[in-house]
């Protein structure tokens, strides 16, 4: 089988009309503005036909079972298909239109059907097994051997060992799940965009804006004007929503936005995801049972570091036990402050962020908005790029390539005169763009025939507040850490030195280890040398005062106990859900999802949301992303990343040898060996929890 369709590959002979930009192949950068919905179907006609021919050739009896004759030609054809479809997927995420959405959904079953059928192809499976047992396999390097092992594992996980009618049922489930997960994602986007709250331009309206930062007010005004309206327009886009929840003195304004945000895609919405969630869970469970596994949670863990759901649950509960005393202390302090200083004796869900920000300001004498004035995006990028250059001996410069929106920027990473990789930056929120932040690969690294190296290209996407009133975009410190996080993923993809496509970069990396480089990079946003280099006040040009940074640092672990328990709540809900919900549905229970979530909260949470909250209906990570029975990966990988960062703390933050070792043992090797082996090679031992607890301030003082 072949790796996921978002990966890139060597282009094969182009038997296609030259005017279809989706047929360019990964050898050139995408012509995004040339891609139209009407290109998708014809391009897939050509690419699917080419892939079918390559599959037939690979399984033919007279095709030698060697890497060159058997593996590479099929990889070339299928990766060309994957590259084109990856462009369509990407555009559907960042430039959603009714026309593109329609053609995406029309063609999604065609693509899924091909990948599923190839993953179940008995002749191909047998040929891979024969290759695995052949002398030709013994001559392969370690990366190619790992790629073959992954292929064989993925065949089994695709139902290749099933017999009819189970095999056909498995394929049907794959297609239905792809459609349901896409619909879940669309519903979240549409429900987010469906809401607006317009504050009128009156004295009473202006009074409702009290407490909001100037840039949030200006952005709301500009948003209203773009819609041809007067006043201030607030939406559920995060850069619009969160300043209200965090700063607005008007409690009714906070409540209105919270209620809308917490019930996105819920039963009160035309885009209700409740039934979709239940269907997704039932199909995932059936898929696992067809493969002889006890639950989807077990199936999800097969290619991951963790051995079993029980091991994951033990890890999460142990961390919850350690975090709980700190969370209880956090909540008690917040309630006391809110009652005494804010006149809020009974904290509601829409008061939490507001009261927390007020407490932080009172305790540490700064606000997030004050800090934001120092983090202008251009300067932040300069600081981030300078850090990467210093740590890993590369240079980052702006480059030129066609984007999909005027705000998109393009960069190249070089080592001396050698091109290492390139990346697109798309950083501002738009209504036609999926919420959140992510990195995805445009194409992967591989060593091509003739000695040419195809260099990797990445998409880096965030949803920050766009510039207003001619000023540069200003980032909160949370935004800065988000940018560093996604850039860590990008470095993992772009700094790889593995020449085998299926295990280069992030390809083939265990999902519960893939967050290691991203969470590792977050730590640098808390180092004074880096912060000093990337800050200047947007109006005065002055660098951030060290005293302000010291107050930020003192507040770094503010409410860390509450935040840790919240992440554990999500992770334990996810893992429990994928073991229990489908069976409960089959037994006739109406809404086991809410019951399971309530039970998890009763076990681990100290702060419970209101009964109307339907967080799960927009939990795209597990119902539309890659984190189903895998959300624990964030905390699992944080143990690894904190321990890796501790090596820099111990040996010197900018000690060149440590940076070179992290590059060589973690970033460069991609998925070519087990993540635990990469960790041990860097750290010289097994992972330890101590650094995570220390970094989160969850160590009792002596």
Feature-to-residue mapping (PLM):
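Active-site-proximal, well-structured secondary-structure segments within enzyme catalytic domains
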Residues: 143, 147, 176-179, 186, ...
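Short His/Asp/Glu-rich catalytic/ion-coordination signatures at enzyme active sites or charged loops
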Residues: 24-39, 88-107, 130-172, 235-275, ...
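Short, hydrophobic/amphipathic alpha-helical patches that form generic packing surfaces
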Residues: 79-90, 149, 153, 259, ...
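Intrinsically disordered or highly flexible coil/loop and linker segments, enriched in small
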Residues: 49, 53, 57-64, 80-97, ...
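N-terminal helix-rich structural modules
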Residues: 2-211, 648
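Short, glycine-/Ser/Thr-/acidic-enriched flexible segments
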Residues: 239-242, 287, 416-418, 427-431, ...
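C-terminal, non-catalytic "cap/extension" segments appended to globular domains
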Residues: 2-39, 46, 219, 231-233, ...
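Short pre-active-site segment immediately N-terminal to the catalytic Zn-binding motif
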Residues: 465-484
